UniProtKB/Swiss-Prot annotation:
GO terms for biological process: tRNA modification. It is an enzyme of class 2 (transferase). Its cofactor is [4Fe-4S] cluster. Residues 135-382 form the Radical SAM core domain. GO terms for cellular component: cytosol. Gene3D superfamilies: Methylthiotransferase, N-terminal domain, Nucleic acid-binding proteins, tm_1862 like domain. This is Ribosomal protein uS12 methylthiotransferase RimO. [4Fe-4S] cluster 2 binds at C149, C153, C156. Residues 384-452 form the TRAM domain. Binds 2 [4Fe-4S] clusters. One cluster is coordinated with 3 cysteines and an exchangeable S-adenosyl-L-methionine. The gene is rimO. GO terms for molecular function: 4 iron, 4 sulfur cluster binding; aspartic acid methylthiotransferase activity; metal ion binding; protein methylthiotransferase activity. [4Fe-4S] cluster 1 binds at C12, C48, C77. PROSITE patterns: MTTASE_N, MTTASE_RADICAL, RADICAL_SAM, TRAM.
Length: 452
């Protein structure tokens, strides 16, 4: 009889892909997924360990799984965290867990599952190649192209948790892309810790795809993704793109999107974090504020439809009021379409904790609120310019009031939405995953209202 596994997935899209890989292997080996703890033979919790709130959420989820089930395997970023004395953090708080692994550890997790719940042997499922299990809606999927990061930003401990950059072979990546599109995916979201650095660790080694040589390099990857996506009338969205000079090369591909309607979207998720040169230096970020602004303005010139999303940290240690005002001015000049902001929070093990002149909590929160107000002001202004225009929208879900979708400028869960009013013809109903053209009739905050 097949064993049943309960599964909890926490954290970022990269962790979500790790969860999907584990679930795919479980499915291939004949295990079933339980809907609740009581129906599971054991539970796997994929954790996040980046910021304090994520650590608390992960520890709480582990505790709940132990209380409800008793047999728990922990994996993910929090599994790599240690106490000051070098002991395992999770075992010190939850000593009854069966095992703890770090991130991207499918093989290790499966070994522990086999130990406590031997896999059902099936002559056929043991031989059939697995199809990837996904936790997202059927019409979009995350594509992880690399693991780890070579940067040593002072506020971040991800390299300690996930290691240095390891790029996936480009042939493997493109094969996964083809299979995802053939399974019905209409939007592919490329994720990593540093998408722009793809291939650096292996000196841009030449791989093969469709019988042709292709370099393990950002431009070559994006160019090929663009071609495959057009063939399948689908979208590709790029996340975690650092503003290196070679990113300039992909802007012409994005500028072509308006002509084709499919391919690589004119959308860049860029983790800028700040704009003032002195703050960026303390953060040990790989680019300067002046160059970032210059590059963004050049990108907008090359691709007028470009949408830029970014995240920022307010109240970093030593940040002055003048430096924060500089950041607000940067948002205005760069016209960042979508922005998120975190008030700086000390992360255990981050070297930024040792910096002088920490900013008081209240000032940190005040600056975060001010930045978000500025971001909303910019976003609302840019969305207002879309009223009356025809736009493409991908439908995420359908209800009695029409459809809920997203434009090319909206990534799932983190950006805005489009409420598409019911079609004029009663017989016409939208379908999840359908890409349609709409006319924008109004805006509400970060969202749009449209009709077909």
């Amino acid at each position: 009889m097949a064993g049943k596994i309960g599964f909890v997935s926490l954290g970022c899209p990269k962790a979500l892909v790790d969860s999907e890989l584990i679930l795919t292997q479980l499915s291939a080996e004949g295990y079933k997924t339980a809907k609740d703890y009581s129906g599971a033979d054991l539970v796997v919790v994929n954790t996040c360990g980046f910021i304090d709130s994520a650590v608390e959420e992960s520890l709480s989820a582990i505790g709940e799984a132990l209380a409800e089930n008793g047999k728990v395997i922990v994996t993910g970023c929090l599994g790599a965290r240690k106490n000051a004395d070098g002991s395992d953090l999770i075992h010190s708080i939850h000593p009854k867990v069966l095992a703890v692994t770090g991130p991207h550890a499918t093989d290790e997790v499966m070994q522990v599952i086999h130990l406590h719940l031997p896999k059902p042997h099936d002559l056929y499922t043991d031989l059939v190649p697995s199809a990837r299990v996904r936790l997202t809606p059927k019409h979009y999927a995350y594509l992880k192209i690399s693991e780890g990061c070579n940067h040593r930003c002072t506020f971040c401990i991800i390299p300690n948790l996930r290691g240095d950059l390891v790029s996936r072979p480009i042939g493997d990546v493109l094969l996964e892309v083809k299979r995802l599109f053939e399974s019905g995916v209409k939007e592919l979201l490329v994720v990593s810790q540093d998408t722009s650095a793809y291939g650096v660790d292996i000196q841009y080694r030449t791989g093969f795809w469709d019988g042709k040589p292709v370099k393990t390099k950002m431009f070559d990857l994006v160019n090929t993704l663009n071609q495959i996506a057009r063939e399948h009338q689908a979208w590709v969205r790029l996340h975690y793109v650092y503003p290196y000079p070679h990113v300039d090369d992909i802007l012409p591909l994005m500028a072509e999107f308006a002509e084709h309607g499919y391919g690589v979207l004119p959308y860049l998720d860029i983790p800028l974090q700040h704009a003032h040169p002195d703050v960026l230096k303390k953060m040990k970020r790989p680019a300067s504020g002046e160059k970032n602004l210059e590059r963004i303005l050049a990108w907008r010139e090359a691709c007028p439809d470009l949408v830029i999303r970014s995240t920022f940290i307010a109240g970093f240690p030593g940040e002055t009021e003048g430096e924060f005002e500089y950041l607000l001015n940067f948002l205005d000049e760069a016209q960042i379409d979508r922005a998120g902001c975190f008030a700086y929070s000390p992360v255990d093990g981050a070297t930024a904790n040792e910096l002088a002149n920490p900013v008081p909590d209240q000032i940190r929160e005040d600056r975060r609120a001010r930045l978000m107000a500025k971001a909303e002001e910019i976003s609302v202004g840019r969305l207002a310019k879309k009223i009356g225009k025809r736009l493409q929208v991908i439908i995420d879900r359908v209800d009695d009031h029409g459809g809920i979708g997203r434009t090319i400028g909206d990534a799932p869960e983190i950006d805005g939405l489009v409420r598409v009013l019911p079609a004029n013809k009663p017989s016409k109903r939208y379908r999840a995953g359908e890409i349609i053209r709409v006319t924008v009739i109004s805006s509400q905050g970060h969202d749009l209202i449209a009709e077909t």
